[in-house]
Amino acid sequence: MALRLAEQGYRVRIFERYPRPGGLARVLEVGGEPLEAFYHHLFTSDRAAVALAEELGVGDLLEWLPSKMGIWTEGRLWDFGTPVSLLRFRPLNPVDKLRFVLATLRLQYTGRYQQFENVSAVEWIRRTQGERVWRTVWGPLFHQKFADRAEQVAMVWLWGKLRLRGRSRSESGMGERLGYMRGSFARLITALESRITAAGGQLVLSEPVRRIERTEGRFQVVTRSGAHPADQVVVAAPVPDHIEIAGHLLDPQELRRLQDLHATAAICTVLELNRSLTPFYWLNIADPEMPFGGLIEHTNYIPRDRYDGRHILYISNYLFPDHPLYRATKEEVLGSYLPALQRVNPSFDRSWILASHHFHADYAQPVVTLGYREQIPEMRTSVPGLYLCCMAQIFPEDRGMNYAIVYGDRAARLVLDDLRRNGSGDPAPEPS
């Protein structure tokens, strides 16, 4: 978004909360190699991300590699995600498997998502796939991700996820190829930052916005370093942050609609191990007794020699901010995870852990409820010159890096259209 505005000659200043740019794609270092704090990959259908990488001269760094999916259920690991693995998946009987496959294919090949907007995901799955499939596969995953809001989730959300994943499968359906950038997606972010600054834009790191004020038709973006004037402001932040810094400017009805939106938070623990935990890249945990929802073993997808031989394991856990584990220390969280990791691999021992890292995201997954389209906040707010570009607007697709780019471009076009329509000669939009 900032790049598109700067390319048109507008003065752009970005206020970034974190010491490094990238948001959920920010990085740490493991074995001297950058690594995302939260696991990231691309699907083959993520055309916007691929196009941006090509535009910025880093497209040759993208690698498309096979990945392997598994599931933990009924106390053991199962290969899961290919026709052969499904045939061998004993927790479901042949009729269950057939219903599961037919329903999944319907979602992957149906383009008309509108039919799922006002349908409960829980009810649809139970009706089309049966109670055993719900209880064995989907139920634990939904409840781990959405807790007591699982019953509120619309089927269109699952349609978006399965349709996206289906497009990354080989024609035979025997595997999924995912995209990763050699040197991490920090290479894409660094290239984007360089292009923005070359176009005259400015990026200010570790400078969270505290408040946005508006006086006599101009904005003041207030940070710890002072008040910064702007003619237009784009808030590229989660809905709660938008409410906190700009809610007092909004129309009361618009503010109430924003307050009615909900999202789960997430904690992501990254372990550097001296050996592999499982044979899978992506392991869904379909067990309500387990304290996390997914194990993503990055080095079962990307060669571990890039990380000085270390095995990298992400432990994914979606929860709401009032969950006790969300405010727990890194050691407390890890302590609660260790017995579960030993269940997954009985040989696992704490001595396998060479280092650990712990990250929070207050706003990680919007809760897409029935009729969500009517709840989506507009990019143009009720305040002229104030815009919102956020995860909650991504629909019907699920959130991800590709759609952050798509919606950022969309917001930039909207701002540019308004500037041209209003005849502004030299505005200074300041995304934050």
Q: Residue ranges of each PLM-predicted region?
A:
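Feature captures the FAD/FMN-dependent oxidoreductase FAD-binding
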Residues: 48-64, 68-80, 128-134, 196-205, ...
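Glycine-rich FAD pyrophosphate-binding loop
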Residues: 6-30
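FAD-binding beta-loop-beta segment adjacent to the flavin cofactor pocket
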Residues: 302-308, 361-388, 392-395
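Dinucleotide-binding Rossmann-like beta1-alpha1 core, especially the glycine-rich loop
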Residues: 31-114
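A conserved FAD-binding loop/helix module that cradles the flavin
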Residues: 392-415
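Mid-domain catalytic core of redox enzymes
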Residues: 8, 207-313, 317-327, 331, ...
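Active-site/ligand-binding neighborhood in enzyme catalytic cores
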Residues: 92, 101-212, 230
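A short, Lys/Arg-enriched amphipathic alpha-helix followed by its capping loop at the start of a domain
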Residues: 1-10, 199
